[in-house]
Curated annotation (Swiss-Prot):
CDD domains per UniProt: CBD_MSL3_like
Protein known as: Mortality factor 4-like protein 1
Disordered, as annotated region: 77-143
Keywords: Acetylation, Chromatin regulator, DNA damage, DNA recombination, DNA repair, Growth regulation, Nucleus, Transcription, Transcription regulation
Length: 323
């Protein structure tokens, strides 16, 4: 019996395509094609997005760049904007009473994610495109319905401990109002904080399975931080500083440069991003338990991790860059 042949890819390297990211379709470019275990996968670059968002995707997420699919892209965008207006796809909120940074980020979650792609986001601005109300959702094929159904049922809430909320507000105030900058490289960077947490959990005599899970969660937090920092975790005033860091340390992961305040900002935003993961509700609940445990660790060690003395007044020449 002749061996089964590998499937033939539908798309070629360099081809312009449309690709699902979450519930929406985005213009993208097929950079590489690979066949593994009889499955075709494509390395995708989303047009206009930071290269950190490049990823391998299965063929089921990729569509031809033709008029019919462009129309489908527009219909999905309108349908999801309607859902956002109804509050059905809201991301995480840190608590009922919010002020300063927390309130700002809640607004970003509900408005910004579908108005601006992650590649050109900014921690200090949002933009909206008003759409007329739709009485009836556009008819789409079953694949698209599956994407929408998945998104509708996921609501990820990451709760920030009360002890940490004042640090979020202070961080926001120091940078946006007092025009100070967090001193970089951080005295204790994100990698070091995560390593200390993993060692702390290990010292408590966890089983091998739990130790493995902690290591996976720590690695995941680090990856999310490095991907999201430049696009979603910075205030406008910090961007020139970030550009300088990239120029001075082009090959360094940002988790080796930034510290606790920026790591804490991640948890205000990460709930909205977790809605895009393919995890079922049980797996998400388990992941949230680990994330909340890490936040408790940050709260317990907040006196050593967070300090206003870690910020410095920006010099006059920096202000000119930040305008």
């Amino acid at each position: 019996m002749a061996p089964k042949q590998d499937p033939k890819p539908k798309f070629q390297e360099g081809e312009r395509v449309l690709c699902f990211h979450g519930p929406l379709l985005y213009e993208a470019k097929c950079v590489k094609v690979a066949i593994k275990d009889k499955q075709v996968k494509y390395f995708i670059h989303y047009s206009g997005w930071n290269k950190n968002w490049d990823e391998w995707v299965p063929e089921s997420r990729v569509l031809k760049y033709v008029d019919a699919n462009l129309q489908k892209q527009r219909e999905l965008q309108k349908a999801n904007q309607e859902q956002y207006a109804e509050g059905k796809m809201r991301g995480a909120a840190p608590g009922k009473k919010t002020s300063g940074l927390q309130q700002k980020n809640v607004e970003v979650k509900t408005k910004k994610n579908k108005q601006k792609t992650p590649g050109n986001g900014d921690g200090g601005s949002t933009s909206e495109t008003p759409q007329p109300p739709r009485k009836k959702r556009a008819r789409v094929d079953p694949t698209v319905e599956n994407e929408e159904t998945f998104m509708n049922r996921v609501e990820v809430k990451v709760k920030i401990p009360e002890e940490l909320k004042p640090w979020l507000v202070d961080d926001w105030d120091l940078i946006t109002r007092q025009k100070q900058l967090f001193y970089l490289p951080a005295k204790k960077n994100v990698d070091s904080i995560l390593e200390d947490y993993a060692n702390y959990k290990k010292s408590r005599g966890n089983t091998d399975n739990k130790e493995y899970a902690v290591n996976e969660v720590v690695a995941g937090i680090k990856e999310y931080f490095n991907v999201m920092l430049g696009t979603q975790l910075l205030y406008k005033f910090e961007r020139p500083q970030y550009a300088e860091i990239l120029a001075d340390h082009p090959d360094a992961p940002m988790s080796q440069v930034y510290g606790a305040p920026h790591l804490l900002r991640l948890f205000v935003r990460i709930g909205a991003m977790l809605a895009y993961t393919p995890l079922d509700e049980k797996s998400l609940a388990l992941l949230l338990n680990y994330l909340h445990d890490f936040l408790k660790y940050l709260a317990k060690n907040s006196a050593t991790l967070f300090s206003a003395s870690d910020y410095e007044v920006a010099p006059p020449e920096y202000h000119r860059k930040a305008v």
